[in-house]
Protein backbone atom coordinates (compact mmCIF):
# COMPACT_ATOMS: atom_id res chain seq x y z
CA UNK A 1 0.00 0.00 0.00
CA UNK A 2 1.41 3.40 -0.93
CA UNK A 3 0.67 6.95 0.12
CA UNK A 4 -1.63 7.63 -2.83
CA UNK A 5 -3.94 4.69 -2.08
CA UNK A 6 -5.18 6.14 1.20
CA UNK A 7 -6.22 9.66 2.10
CA UNK A 8 -4.46 11.47 4.93
CA UNK A 9 -6.50 11.61 8.15
CA UNK A 10 -8.48 14.68 9.10
CA UNK A 11 -5.99 16.09 11.59
CA UNK A 12 -8.55 18.34 13.29
CA UNK A 13 -10.40 15.26 14.54
CA UNK A 14 -7.63 12.68 14.68
CA UNK A 15 -5.72 14.03 17.68
CA UNK A 16 -8.45 15.06 20.09
CA UNK A 17 -7.70 11.96 22.12
CA UNK A 18 -4.59 9.73 22.30
CA UNK A 19 -5.09 6.57 20.26
CA UNK A 20 -4.01 4.53 23.28
CA UNK A 21 -7.22 5.68 25.01
CA UNK A 22 -9.38 5.83 21.89
CA UNK A 23 -8.73 2.18 21.01
CA UNK A 24 -8.45 0.80 24.54
CA UNK A 25 -10.51 -2.44 24.66
CA UNK A 26 -13.63 -2.30 26.83
CA UNK A 27 -14.14 -6.07 27.13
CA UNK A 28 -11.66 -8.60 28.52
CA UNK A 29 -12.09 -10.76 25.40
CA UNK A 30 -10.81 -7.89 23.20
CA UNK A 31 -7.47 -7.55 25.03
CA UNK A 32 -4.70 -8.58 22.61
CA UNK A 33 -2.13 -11.27 23.43
CA UNK A 34 -1.53 -13.14 26.71
CA UNK A 35 -4.30 -15.63 25.93
CA UNK A 36 -3.83 -17.62 29.18
CA UNK A 37 -4.10 -14.52 31.39
CA UNK A 38 -7.09 -13.20 29.42
CA UNK A 39 -8.81 -16.62 29.65
CA UNK A 40 -8.42 -16.59 33.47
CA UNK A 41 -9.93 -13.11 33.68
CA UNK A 42 -12.80 -14.14 31.38
CA UNK A 43 -13.54 -17.04 33.74
CA UNK A 44 -13.69 -14.56 36.64
CA UNK A 45 -16.04 -12.30 34.63
CA UNK A 46 -18.36 -15.27 33.91
CA UNK A 47 -18.25 -16.52 37.50
CA UNK A 48 -18.83 -13.03 38.93
CA UNK A 49 -16.80 -13.64 42.09
CA UNK A 50 -13.51 -11.79 41.72
CA UNK A 51 -10.63 -12.68 44.07
CA UNK A 52 -7.94 -10.19 45.06
CA UNK A 53 -5.60 -10.00 42.05
CA UNK A 54 -1.99 -9.13 41.29
CA UNK A 55 -1.39 -8.51 37.57
CA UNK A 56 2.33 -8.67 36.93
CA UNK A 57 4.27 -8.01 33.72
CA UNK A 58 6.19 -5.50 31.55
CA UNK A 59 4.69 -2.09 30.64
CA UNK A 60 2.19 -1.90 27.78
CA UNK A 61 1.08 -5.54 27.87
CA UNK A 62 -2.55 -4.93 28.88
CA UNK A 63 -2.55 -5.21 32.69
CA UNK A 64 -4.48 -2.01 33.46
CA UNK A 65 -6.75 -2.42 30.43
CA UNK A 66 -7.60 -5.99 31.50
CA UNK A 67 -8.55 -5.06 35.06
CA UNK A 68 -10.57 -1.99 33.94
CA UNK A 69 -12.43 -4.16 31.39
CA UNK A 70 -13.05 -6.81 34.06
CA UNK A 71 -14.42 -4.17 36.46
CA UNK A 72 -16.76 -2.84 33.74
CA UNK A 73 -18.03 -6.35 32.96
CA UNK A 74 -18.57 -7.23 36.63
CA UNK A 75 -20.15 -3.98 37.81
CA UNK A 76 -21.84 -2.57 34.69
CA UNK A 77 -23.65 0.72 35.44
CA UNK A 78 -22.41 0.68 39.07
CA UNK A 79 -18.78 1.02 37.87
CA UNK A 80 -18.43 4.74 38.63
CA UNK A 81 -19.41 4.51 42.30
CA UNK A 82 -18.05 1.01 43.04
CA UNK A 83 -14.49 1.39 41.69
CA UNK A 84 -11.61 3.37 43.20
CA UNK A 85 -8.62 3.71 40.86
CA UNK A 86 -5.26 5.01 42.11
CA UNK A 87 -2.26 5.17 39.78
CA UNK A 88 1.37 6.26 40.08
CA UNK A 89 0.50 9.97 39.82
CA UNK A 90 -1.64 9.76 42.98
CA UNK A 91 -0.20 9.99 46.48
CA UNK A 92 -0.38 6.43 47.81
CA UNK A 93 1.47 6.69 51.08
CA UNK A 94 0.36 5.53 54.49
CA UNK A 95 -2.27 8.30 54.89
CA UNK A 96 -4.00 7.42 51.60
CA UNK A 97 -4.29 3.75 52.57
CA UNK A 98 -5.51 4.64 56.06
CA UNK A 99 -7.99 7.28 54.92
CA UNK A 100 -9.00 7.26 51.25
CA UNK A 101 -8.94 3.49 50.64
CA UNK A 102 -10.39 2.72 54.07
CA UNK A 103 -13.24 5.24 53.59
CA UNK A 104 -14.02 3.75 50.17
CA UNK A 105 -14.03 0.22 51.64
CA UNK A 106 -16.46 1.37 54.37
CA UNK A 107 -18.79 3.09 51.88
CA UNK A 108 -22.13 1.35 51.28
CA UNK A 109 -22.88 0.67 47.61
CA UNK A 110 -25.85 -1.37 46.35
CA UNK A 111 -24.55 -4.06 43.97
CA UNK A 112 -25.85 -7.29 42.48
CA UNK A 113 -25.55 -10.34 44.78
CA UNK A 114 -22.03 -11.77 44.73
CA UNK A 115 -20.45 -8.54 43.40
CA UNK A 116 -17.89 -6.46 45.32
CA UNK A 117 -16.45 -2.96 45.23
CA UNK A 118 -13.05 -2.90 43.51
CA UNK A 119 -9.91 -0.93 44.40
CA UNK A 120 -7.46 -0.75 41.47
CA UNK A 121 -3.85 0.14 42.37
CA UNK A 122 -1.73 0.73 39.27
CA UNK A 123 2.07 0.41 39.58
CA UNK A 124 1.63 -1.01 43.08
CA UNK A 125 5.31 -1.98 43.24
CA UNK A 126 6.15 1.71 43.74
CA UNK A 127 4.18 1.84 47.02
CA UNK A 128 6.25 2.07 50.19
CA UNK A 129 6.59 -0.97 52.43
CA UNK A 130 4.66 0.83 55.20
CA UNK A 131 1.76 1.59 52.86
CA UNK A 132 1.71 -2.04 51.72
CA UNK A 133 1.59 -3.23 55.34
CA UNK A 134 -1.37 -0.92 56.02
CA UNK A 135 -3.04 -2.16 52.82
CA UNK A 136 -2.65 -5.78 53.98
CA UNK A 137 -4.70 -5.03 57.10
CA UNK A 138 -7.37 -3.17 55.09
CA UNK A 139 -7.66 -6.10 52.65
CA UNK A 140 -8.21 -8.42 55.60
CA UNK A 141 -10.86 -6.34 57.40
CA UNK A 142 -12.99 -5.49 54.36
CA UNK A 143 -12.68 -8.80 52.48
CA UNK A 144 -16.49 -9.29 52.54
CA UNK A 145 -17.27 -6.09 50.61
CA UNK A 146 -14.15 -5.02 48.71
CA UNK A 147 -11.71 -6.67 46.30
CA UNK A 148 -8.26 -5.33 45.40
CA UNK A 149 -6.49 -5.49 42.03
CA UNK A 150 -2.79 -4.54 41.98
CA UNK A 151 -0.94 -3.99 38.69
CA UNK A 152 2.87 -4.06 38.88
CA UNK A 153 5.96 -4.72 36.75
CA UNK A 154 7.51 -7.20 39.18
CA UNK A 155 5.42 -9.06 41.75
CA UNK A 156 8.50 -9.63 43.93
CA UNK A 157 8.28 -5.97 45.05
CA UNK A 158 4.88 -6.66 46.62
CA UNK A 159 5.25 -7.83 50.22
CA UNK A 160 4.64 -11.54 50.90
CA UNK A 161 1.51 -11.08 53.07
CA UNK A 162 -0.25 -9.31 50.17
CA UNK A 163 0.98 -11.86 47.61
CA UNK A 164 -0.45 -14.69 49.70
CA UNK A 165 -3.89 -13.01 49.71
CA UNK A 166 -4.01 -12.59 45.92
CA UNK A 167 -4.24 -14.66 42.77
CA UNK A 168 -1.25 -13.72 40.59
CA UNK A 169 -1.88 -13.30 36.84
CA UNK A 170 1.31 -12.93 34.80
CA UNK A 171 1.52 -10.99 31.53
CA UNK A 172 4.38 -11.25 29.03
CA UNK A 173 5.52 -9.01 26.17
CA UNK A 174 3.31 -9.15 23.09
CA UNK A 175 4.53 -10.91 19.95
CA UNK A 176 5.16 -8.96 16.73
CA UNK A 177 2.05 -10.54 15.15
CA UNK A 178 -0.17 -9.50 18.06
CA UNK A 179 1.06 -5.90 17.86
CA UNK A 180 0.69 -5.88 14.06
CA UNK A 181 -2.90 -7.10 14.36
CA UNK A 182 -3.85 -4.18 16.60
CA UNK A 183 -1.90 -1.66 14.47
CA UNK A 184 -3.79 -2.79 11.35
CA UNK A 185 -7.12 -2.14 13.11
CA UNK A 186 -6.03 1.40 14.07
CA UNK A 187 -4.48 2.11 10.65
CA UNK A 188 -7.73 1.08 8.91
CA UNK A 189 -9.93 3.08 11.31
CA UNK A 190 -7.83 6.26 11.05
CA UNK A 191 -7.13 5.86 7.29
CA UNK A 192 -3.40 6.19 7.90
CA UNK A 193 -1.18 6.17 4.77
CA UNK A 194 1.68 3.73 5.32
CA UNK A 195 4.11 1.25 3.80
CA UNK A 196 4.65 -2.21 5.41
CA UNK A 197 8.25 -1.30 6.31
CA UNK A 198 6.89 1.58 8.41
CA UNK A 199 4.77 -0.77 10.52
CA UNK A 200 7.77 -3.12 10.86
CA UNK A 201 9.78 -0.17 12.23
CA UNK A 202 7.02 0.64 14.74
CA UNK A 203 6.96 -3.00 15.91
CA UNK A 204 10.77 -2.94 16.22
CA UNK A 205 10.78 0.24 18.34
CA UNK A 206 7.87 -0.99 20.51
CA UNK A 207 9.68 -4.18 21.58
CA UNK A 208 6.51 -5.95 22.72
CA UNK A 209 4.88 -2.85 24.27
CA UNK A 210 1.45 -2.12 22.74
CA UNK A 211 1.19 1.33 24.35
CA UNK A 212 4.55 2.31 22.87
CA UNK A 213 3.52 1.01 19.44
CA UNK A 214 0.30 3.07 19.34
CA UNK A 215 2.03 6.19 20.66
CA UNK A 216 4.80 5.84 18.05
CA UNK A 217 2.22 5.35 15.29
CA UNK A 218 0.25 8.43 16.32
CA UNK A 219 3.41 10.55 16.73
CA UNK A 220 4.63 9.54 13.25
CA UNK A 221 1.28 10.35 11.62
CA UNK A 222 1.12 13.63 13.54
CA UNK A 223 4.63 14.67 12.48
CA UNK A 224 4.87 13.36 8.91
CA UNK A 225 1.34 12.30 7.81
CA UNK A 226 2.94 9.13 6.38
CA UNK A 227 4.33 6.04 8.10
CA UNK A 228 7.57 4.76 6.62
CA UNK A 229 10.77 3.46 8.17
CA UNK A 230 12.70 6.73 8.04
CA UNK A 231 9.89 8.78 9.61
CA UNK A 232 9.34 6.27 12.42
CA UNK A 233 12.99 6.27 13.50
CA UNK A 234 13.11 10.09 13.32
CA UNK A 235 10.09 10.39 15.61
CA UNK A 236 11.21 7.66 18.02
CA UNK A 237 14.75 9.05 18.01
CA UNK A 238 16.36 5.62 18.00
CA UNK A 239 19.40 4.56 15.94
CA UNK A 240 18.29 3.14 12.60
CA UNK A 241 18.69 -0.66 12.78
CA UNK A 242 20.08 -0.74 9.22
CA UNK A 243 23.01 1.50 10.27
CA UNK A 244 23.64 -0.73 13.29
CA UNK A 245 23.31 -3.87 11.16
CA UNK A 246 25.88 -2.52 8.67
CA UNK A 247 28.21 -1.79 11.60
CA UNK A 248 27.94 -5.42 12.78
CA UNK A 249 28.40 -6.66 9.20
CA UNK A 250 31.58 -4.61 8.81
CA UNK A 251 33.02 -6.15 12.00
CA UNK A 252 32.15 -9.68 10.86
CA UNK A 253 33.63 -8.96 7.41
CA UNK A 254 36.91 -7.83 8.98
CA UNK A 255 36.37 -4.11 8.22
CA UNK A 256 36.98 -2.91 11.76
CA UNK A 257 37.88 0.71 10.88
CA UNK A 258 34.64 1.15 8.91
CA UNK A 259 32.65 -0.27 11.84
CA UNK A 260 34.33 2.22 14.22
CA UNK A 261 33.51 5.09 11.83
CA UNK A 262 29.84 4.01 11.75
CA UNK A 263 29.80 3.90 15.56
CA UNK A 264 31.33 7.40 15.76
CA UNK A 265 28.65 8.70 13.35
CA UNK A 266 25.86 7.29 15.54
CA UNK A 267 27.48 8.71 18.67
CA UNK A 268 27.94 12.15 17.05
CA UNK A 269 24.24 12.20 16.08
CA UNK A 270 23.53 12.42 19.81
CA UNK A 271 22.20 8.92 20.45
CA UNK A 272 22.87 7.76 23.98
CA UNK A 273 25.12 4.70 24.43
CA UNK A 274 22.15 2.90 26.02
CA UNK A 275 20.04 3.50 22.87
CA UNK A 276 22.87 2.28 20.64
CA UNK A 277 23.55 -0.87 22.64
CA UNK A 278 19.82 -1.69 23.01
CA UNK A 279 19.35 -1.47 19.23
CA UNK A 280 22.58 -3.45 18.78
CA UNK A 281 21.21 -6.23 21.00
CA UNK A 282 17.97 -6.47 19.00
CA UNK A 283 19.86 -6.45 15.68
CA UNK A 284 22.25 -9.24 16.77
CA UNK A 285 19.31 -11.27 18.09
CA UNK A 286 17.74 -11.28 14.59
CA UNK A 287 21.01 -11.40 12.60
CA UNK A 288 21.59 -14.47 10.43
CA UNK A 289 24.88 -15.92 11.71
CA UNK A 290 26.31 -19.08 13.25
CA UNK A 291 24.74 -19.84 16.64
CA UNK A 292 28.10 -19.99 18.45
CA UNK A 293 28.99 -16.54 17.08
CA UNK A 294 25.59 -15.07 18.02
CA UNK A 295 25.85 -16.39 21.60
CA UNK A 296 29.32 -14.89 22.05
CA UNK A 297 28.26 -11.50 20.62
CA UNK A 298 25.18 -11.38 22.85
CA UNK A 299 27.29 -12.25 25.89
CA UNK A 300 29.77 -9.45 25.16
CA UNK A 301 26.89 -7.02 24.49
CA UNK A 302 25.42 -7.87 27.89
CA UNK A 303 28.71 -7.21 29.69
CA UNK A 304 29.18 -3.89 27.85
CA UNK A 305 25.61 -2.84 28.69
CA UNK A 306 26.25 -3.56 32.36
CA UNK A 307 29.40 -1.39 32.37
CA UNK A 308 27.64 1.44 30.50
CA UNK A 309 24.78 1.38 33.05
CA UNK A 310 27.43 1.81 35.75
CA UNK A 311 28.44 5.05 33.99
CA UNK A 312 31.85 3.87 32.82
CA UNK A 313 33.36 5.72 29.76
CA UNK A 314 30.51 5.01 27.40
CA UNK A 315 32.00 5.61 23.93
CA UNK A 316 35.14 3.80 25.01
CA UNK A 317 33.03 0.82 26.12
CA UNK A 318 31.18 0.74 22.77
CA UNK A 319 34.48 0.84 20.86
CA UNK A 320 35.85 -1.89 23.11
CA UNK A 321 32.71 -3.94 22.38
CA UNK A 322 33.40 -3.76 18.63
CA UNK A 323 36.98 -4.89 19.33
CA UNK A 324 35.60 -7.84 21.32
CA UNK A 325 33.33 -8.68 18.37
CA UNK A 326 36.36 -8.70 16.05
CA UNK A 327 38.23 -10.94 18.50
CA UNK A 328 35.30 -13.37 18.70
CA UNK A 329 35.21 -13.47 14.89
CA UNK A 330 38.95 -14.24 14.68
CA UNK A 331 38.63 -16.97 17.33
CA UNK A 332 35.70 -18.50 15.44
CA UNK A 333 37.69 -18.45 12.18
CA UNK A 334 40.73 -20.06 13.82
CA UNK A 335 38.67 -22.90 15.24
Swiss-Prot record:
Q: Which Pfam families match?
A: AAA, Rep_fac_C
Coiled coil region boundaries:
none
Superkingdom of the source?
Eukaryota
Q: Which GO terms describe its biological process?
A: DNA repair; DNA-templated DNA replication
Write out the residues that bind ATP. Answer: 56-63
Tissue expr: Expressed in roots, leaves, shoot apical meristem (SAM), flag leaves and panicles.
> SMART domains, per this entry?
AAA
Alphabetic keyword roster? ATP-binding, DNA replication, Nucleotide-binding, Nucleus
Molecular functions (GO terms): ATP binding; ATP hydrolysis activity; DNA binding
Induction statement: Down-regulated by sucrose starvation.
An example Gene Ontology cellular component term from the record? Answer: DNA replication factor C complex
SUPFAM superfamilies, sorted? P-loop containing nucleoside triphosphate hydrolases, post-AAA+ oligomerization domain-like
Q: Where in the cell is it found?
A: Nucleus
Q: Which InterPro entries match?
A: AAA+_ATPase (IPR003593), ATPase_AAA_core (IPR003959), DNA_pol3_clamp-load_cplx_C (IPR008921), DNA_Rep/Repair_Clamp_Loader (IPR050238), P-loop_NTPase (IPR027417), Rep_factorC_C (IPR013748), RFC_lid (IPR047854)
Please give the subunit comment from the record: Heterotetramer of subunits RFC2, RFC3, RFC4 and RFC5 that can form a complex with RFC1.
Return the similarity comment: Belongs to the activator 1 small subunits family.
Q: State the protein's purpose.
A: May be involved in DNA replication and thus regulate cell proliferation.
Q: What is this protein called?
A: Replication factor C subunit 4
Q: What is the organism of origin for this protein?
A: Oryza sativa subsp. japonica (Rice)
Show the taxonomic lineage: Eukaryota, Viridiplantae, Streptophyta, Embryophyta, Tracheophyta
- From the UniProt record, report the name of the gene that encodes this protein: RFC4
Amino acid sequence: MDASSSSAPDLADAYDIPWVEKYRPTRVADVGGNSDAVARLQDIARDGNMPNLILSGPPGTGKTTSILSLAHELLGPSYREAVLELNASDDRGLDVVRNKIKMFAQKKVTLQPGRHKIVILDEADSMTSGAQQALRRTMEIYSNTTRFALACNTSSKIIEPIQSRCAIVRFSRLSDQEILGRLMIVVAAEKVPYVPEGLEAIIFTADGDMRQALNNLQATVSGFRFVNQENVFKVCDQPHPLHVKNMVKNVLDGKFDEACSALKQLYDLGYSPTDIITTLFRVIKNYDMAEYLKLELLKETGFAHMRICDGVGSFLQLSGLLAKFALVRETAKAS
